[in-house]
Regions:
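An anion/pyrophosphate-binding glycine-rich loop and adjacent beta-alpha core
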Residues: 89-91, 98-243, 247
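Catalytic phosphate/nucleotide-handling subdomain of diverse soluble enzymes
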Residues: 326, 330-378
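A conserved short coil-to-beta-strand element within the FAD-binding core of flavoproteins
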Residues: 3-30
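Glycine-rich loop(s) and the adjacent beta-strand/alpha-helix scaffold that form part
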Residues: 37-39, 44-116, 156, 356, ...
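Short, well-ordered coil/turn residues at beta-beta hairpins
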Residues: 7, 47, 51-56, 137, ...
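A glycine-rich dinucleotide-binding beta-alpha-beta segment and adjacent secondary-structure elements
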Residues: 243-345, 349
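Active-site and channel-lining beta-strand-loop segments
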Residues: 21-24, 130-145, 314-327
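Short, small/polar residue-rich loop motifs at catalytic or cofactor-binding pockets
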Residues: 127-129, 310-312, 356
Length: 380
């Protein structure tokens, strides 16, 4: 579903069409989608009074960088459109609002460049199963339990404190086909379009999935038949020879021996085997354990991962009516907050590690509460 504004220069209202979903890429969707419904919103005299005497700030934002995560990388991909820049936080602060929870952020370490970007520095998050080796920028394995799919925020902190701008997944084609997924509705046309036939490709062997097509186009994927060839391409992509081929080959061989013998103590290999005890993961999420260097499972694949910005979990301190509070605890006259900027009821009700669908309910609830409170204040 999409919105196509037809409001023109009228700043007192909005007329729009609700567009039917299509499976075309976002850049051409509006040109081909069919209108399913239309609506108009017009500002009444009472609404214009609200603009003059009371303002509600419903916004999402990304701002700040927590000291506990180490220095912010010079190069980051953007997981949100350009307009989601956090500037409204500073605007509210300049009006007297108190910001809290500025160290509460959620970013992802598994970002890759979108080969068909919709906004600047558009990044896509890889949702990986547990089998790939996760390496730092020097080609060394991350410590336990920083495995794919385990503790994304822990990886962000580890890489930041170590001064690494990027990291790597090391896997092979068989693991890529079985375990990789992409975050976002645009990257999952089978789910977005409710296409059961396309969805079945995720479970059927020998099928080319949308993820594999994406991987062929994305410049952050490199492939080779041997570790030495792969390292040469990894260093070329990174722009500097930071990874030693002999050291990485020893790492891969040690991992493969543990898988082959079935007697090793490698925590990641053990965790992968445990994940396959759940039938759904065994069918569509976790590849059967095998050697990374198995020629039948090749070629080898390395993915250069960059930091992907996503969420500021703190925000403006509010009371239970959604009124924004100043440093002295008193409401800022006429200023209300709703949505992510309110932290869903006080600037950070979800703590440090809330994400994904847990945001929607808080946005709806805080919007309802602050809207009612503002209406009551105007009616008084």
């Amino acid at each position: 579903m999409g919105l196509e504004s037809t409001a023109g220069s009228d700043r007192r209202g909005l007329a729009a069409e609700v567009l039917a979903g299509t499976r075309r890429r976002a850049a051409v969707r509006r040109a081909h989608a069919r209108p399913k419904a239309t609506f108009e919103l017009r500002a009444s005299a009472r609404a214009r009074h609200v603009r003059r005497h009371g303002r509600r700030l419903p916004t999402s934002c990304v701002a700040n960088w927590p000291e506990r995560l180490g220095p912010a990388p010079d190069h980051m991909l953007s997981g949100v459109p350009d307009h989601v820049d956090g500037r409204m936080l500073e605007t509210a602060r300049s009006a007297g609002a108190r910001l809290i929870g500025a160290d509460r952020m959620w970013h992802y370490p598994e970002g890759v460049r979108n080969p068909e970007p919709i906004w600047s520095r558009h990044g896509i998050r890889i949702l990986s199963g547990p089998s790939p080796l996760w390496l730092d920028a020097n080609g060394r394995r991350l410590p336990t339990p920083l495995f794919p799919g385990f503790d994304a925020l822990g990886v962000v902190e580890h890489l930041g404190r170590a001064g690494h701008e990027h990291s790597w997944f090391l896997l092979n084609q068989r693991i890529l086909a079985a375990e990789f997924a992409l975050s976002g509705s645009e990257q999952n046309p089978d789910l977005t379009g409710r296409d059961r036939r396309m969805l079945l490709k995720r479970a059927l062997p020998g099928q080319t999935t949308y993820v594999e097509e994406f991987a062929r186009r994305c410049p952050d994927f490199v492939r080779a038949d041997t570790v030495r060839e792969l390292v040469e391409r990894m260093n070329g992509l990174a722009g500097e020879p930071r990874i030693d081929a002999e050291e990485l080959e020893r790492t891969v061989l040690a991992r493969d021996r543990q898988v082959e013998s079935g007697l090793g103590k490698d925590a990641q290999v053990t965790a992968t085997a445990a994940a396959r005890r759940f039938i759904a993961d065994r069918l569509v999420r976790v590849a059967k354990p095998h050697r990374l260097l198995d020629p039948a499972a090749g070629p080898l694949v390395a993915v250069k991962l960059s930091m992907l910005t996503r969420k500021t979990l703190g925000g403006l301190e509010t009371d239970l009516a959604g009124r924004v509070l100043a440093a002295d605890g008193e409401p800022v006259a006429g200023l209300y907050a709703a949505g992510e900027v309110a932290g869903f009821g006080g600037g950070g009700v979800h703590g440090y590690r809330a994400l994904e669908g847990t945001f929607l309910g808080g946005c709806l609830f805080s919007g309802r509460v602050s809207g009612r409170a503002l209406a009551q204040a105007l009616a008084a």
